[in-house]
């Protein structure tokens, strides 16, 4: 009995040991798949293991790994649930919450992401991932609120239900050929990628026909294999074709290389490995310098800054040099991928490490005078909450394509971007200054610094109608509004240095010629008539009115208070009126256009609605001697000050300027 008992225990122990060994073996296999970046395959293997694990802590660790697989494969929504479970573990909370925050960013929920990053920092103040993630999320919110002229829309002629990415254009004067990568159903391979769980990507092309319509998308069967091809780069006016091709054995990714194909009788033929690195290494995403002597690409190679870097290789006859790193001007400890060289001084790429709006962002680098690259995040709308990469920019136009899995995408989609020309407009109304009534049939003349002139009589029959003019860029404008019986209206503005569309809106208020206008704040010393410097500065605005209305003849009148004799006040006011006209003459206004008249105290002021600022001086009050005597001493001084004034009145509007 004891022998049987011991034998049974031994068999159970051996069985448990065998099960544990089998599970450990499967776990190692799943870990190896993950290390090989076969994330979808690893996810399936971890999921199978999870069902057989009883230990709670081990289950949570596997849940976290499943979340990582989904995240790295781009299935962010599916990654949320396993990360939430892992976040309950003290040991995994920080990593899991950081991932959850990154998922919220991918979904465009920046405020939720900010909350999660802050929760991590409350527990671990020096966590680099949370600190940089928080900075990026806050920066992204700012970017969405900045104005932009760029229009971006999905390139429906290139997109399918699968992943479509990395376009390259053979620019042919309106008959563009667009080459791109896709995992669509028509892709050649029958097996599924261990990385994404989708079909392997192939190369495809479509082109504009002579009617301006896109032809059906076709696969490049001469270059496609059973495995991944992608990231095309057209060069030499459509005669050379660079692309990435990857091989796999027994379902395992064996790395990627850059190939070059030649166009023969209209077909891409003779694909050849450039041989930049050995087959044991992996490189991809080629772009070529304008002279064809450099190939830039992305790779994880020894001597880099961490993650994937941008490297280049130089052509030596029929071979290519060993890779050289582009340096810290471009590369970081994160991933730099998908380079595109537009010209010798403009270089695009995507990065995860510079402050981004989420995942990969597109950056542009300009070569400065010191030979160094200066990088800038292209901001919204080039970048978004998702991964943005694979940009192609037309050589001589502000338009192109990019790839994104932003909101509204079905996986990775290709988007078309354009920068429409700046639009500037002038619009507005013309009203009577006093009555605020619409002034109909005004003549508006618009003068541009480029020598242009537009003139139109504007009919404004009701409050909803406005005058409208289209304007040019980088131009200074003066517009003049004229109407019989009114002073001319004038204003200046410029479209120079403006980077965004703008409508200049003006409500032009014209002042009637049939009224006396007080020139405010013209002050004289007691009993004197010489103009003070502040008074001259005020009179300059009236000089401008005379210049802008060259046909008017005016009376410039001076008035005094009632202190002193009638005779002395009359003489003083005449001298003051003469001082004003003399000043106008010194500014170039002909004497024939002015009449100086001193009225002394004979025309006391009548308070208008504009002057009724004192409760003891209501509108309509005449400031004569009897009224002033009825006021207190302090109030009398105010009333006397109101009577001391310079006024302007239009006598005629038919003056003909001299031709001299």
Regions from the PLM with identified roles:
Residues 52-55, 89, 123:
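Structural marker of alpha-solenoid helical repeat scaffolds
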Residues 351, 356-358, 559-660:
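Periplasmic OmpA-like peptidoglycan-binding domain that tethers envelope proteins to the cell wall
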Residues 72, 99, 106-112, 116-429, ...:
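Short, conserved micro-motifs composed of acidic
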Residues 422-553, 592, 614-616, 636-639, ...:
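Periplasmic peptidoglycan-binding/tethering modules of Gram-negative envelope proteins
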């Amino acid at each position: 009995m004891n022998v049987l008992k011991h034998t049974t225990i031994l068999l159970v122990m051996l069985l448990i040991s065998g099960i544990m060994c089998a599970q450990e073996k499967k776990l190692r296999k799943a870990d190896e798949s993950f290390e090989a970046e076969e994330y979808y395959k690893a996810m399936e293997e971890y999921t199978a293991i999870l069902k057989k694990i009883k230990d709670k802590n081990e289950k949570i660790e596997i849940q976290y790994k499943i979340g990582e697989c989904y995240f790295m494969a781009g299935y962010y929504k599916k990654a949320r649930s396993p990360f939430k479970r892992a976040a309950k573990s003290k040991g995994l909370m920080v990593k899991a919450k950081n991932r959850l925050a990154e998922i919220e960013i991918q979904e465009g929920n920046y405020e939720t992401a900010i909350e999660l990053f802050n929760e991590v920092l409350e527990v671990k103040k020096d966590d680099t991932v949370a600190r940089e993630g928080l900075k990026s999320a806050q920066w992204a919110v700012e970017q969405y609120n900045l104005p932009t002229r760029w229009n971006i829309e999905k390139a429906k002629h290139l997109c399918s239900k699968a992943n479509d990415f990395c376009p390259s254009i053979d620019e042919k004067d309106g008959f563009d050929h667009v080459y791109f990568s896709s995992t669509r159903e028509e892709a050649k391979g029958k097996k599924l990628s261990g990385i994404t769980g989708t079909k392997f990507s192939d190369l495809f092309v479509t082109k504009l026909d002579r009617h301006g319509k896109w032809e059906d998308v076709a696969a490049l069967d001469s270059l496609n294999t059973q495995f991944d091809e992608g990231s095309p780069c057209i060069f030499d006016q459509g005669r050379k074709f660079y692309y990435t091709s990857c091989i796999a054995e027994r379902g395992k990714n064996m790395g990627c290389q850059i190939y070059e194909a030649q166009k023969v009788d209209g077909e891409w033929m003779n694909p050849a490995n450039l041989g930049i690195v050995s087959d044991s290494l992996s490189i991809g995403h080629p772009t070529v310098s304008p002279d064809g002597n450099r190939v830039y690409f992305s790779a994880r190679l020894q001597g880099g800054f961490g993650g994937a870097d941008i490297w280049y290789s130089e052509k030596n006859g029929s071979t290519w040099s060993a890779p050289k790193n582009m340096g810290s001007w471009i590369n970081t400890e994160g991933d730099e991928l998908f380079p595109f060289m537009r010209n010798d001084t403009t270089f695009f790429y995507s990065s995860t490490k510079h402050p981004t709006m989420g995942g990969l962002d597109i950056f542009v680098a300009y070569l400065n005078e010191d030979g160094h690259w200066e990088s800038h995040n292209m901001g919204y709308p080039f970048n978004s909450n998702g991964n943005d990469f694979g940009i192609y920019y037309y050589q001589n136009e502000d338009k192109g394509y990019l790839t994104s899995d932003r909101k509204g995408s079905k996986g990775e989609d290709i988007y078309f971007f354009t920068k429409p020309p700046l639009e500037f407009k002038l619009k507005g109304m013309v009203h009577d200054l006093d009555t605020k009534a619409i002034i109909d049939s005004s003549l508006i003349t618009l003068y541009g610094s480029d020598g242009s002139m537009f003139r139109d009589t504007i009919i404004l029959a009701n409050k909803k109608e406005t005058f409208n003019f289209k304007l040019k860029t980088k131009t200074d404008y003066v517009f003049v509004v004229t109407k019989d019986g009114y002073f001319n209206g004038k204003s200046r503005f410029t479209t120079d240095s403006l980077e965004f569309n703008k409508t200049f809106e003006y409500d032009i208020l014209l002042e009637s010629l049939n009224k006396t206008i007080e020139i405010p704040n013209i002050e004289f010393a007691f009993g004197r008539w010489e103009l003070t410097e502040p008074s001259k500065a005020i009179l300059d605005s009236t000089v401008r009115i005379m210049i802008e209305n060259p046909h008017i003849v005016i009376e410039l009148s001076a008035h005094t208070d009632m202190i002193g004799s009638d005779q002395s006040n009359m003489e003083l006011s005449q001298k003051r009126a003469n001082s004003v006209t003399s000043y106008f003459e010194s500014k170039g206004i002909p004497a024939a256009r002015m009449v100086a008249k001193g009225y002394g105290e004979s025309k006391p002021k009548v308070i208008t609605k504009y002057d009724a600022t004192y409760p003891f001086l209501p509108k309509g009050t005449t400031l004569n001697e009897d009224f002033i005597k009825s006021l207190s001493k302090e109030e009398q001084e105010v009333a006397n000050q109101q009577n001391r004034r310079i006024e302007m009145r239009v006598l005629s509007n038919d003056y003909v300027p001299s031709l001299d």
